[in-house]
């Protein structure tokens, strides 16, 4: 977690983000994932890009981005840094009839955190359920804020590579926790009865899945496939 955004880090990892919408769709069909760059799909956003970087703090664009996803995915996992905005974002997903996990760490980051508790709003079938998640209850060691603080794109790309290489530690822990949130949302969209099971049990299962995907090398292989597809 840092001032360096996802697009910056993906670029440092070799993912070509300067793709037209048709190629973004092609990459998705070839690889199974893709990156929807706001500057390409919402050209108006680019006029605020420089100011956002200069300000260096979250703005309304951090909230608008996930809500303006042109794909309109049936399942979403979205972090919001402003606590008062979290229920509002959850309400948008409810109005759309979508499934989502919307969350904020008590340390103020727009992620599920490993430094303490996270507040989670689970949206499914027009209802919103609120949860509190302590990562230690999921078997993840408590981290210090400085343990998960990133820097520039190259530094964060190196951290990503170390996680993909199987290195253990606080960075891997927060990665698998947030990956689990996305997997829980996806499972819930496919089977709404999943909501009847405890969120902690579902998160624990998906953390195990994320860990095995890293340890097996499948995540590393998928990144390499993704990079190649965006460069072709």
What residues fall within each predicted segment?
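Glycine-rich anion-binding loops and their surrounding alpha/beta cores
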Residues: 11-18, 23-232
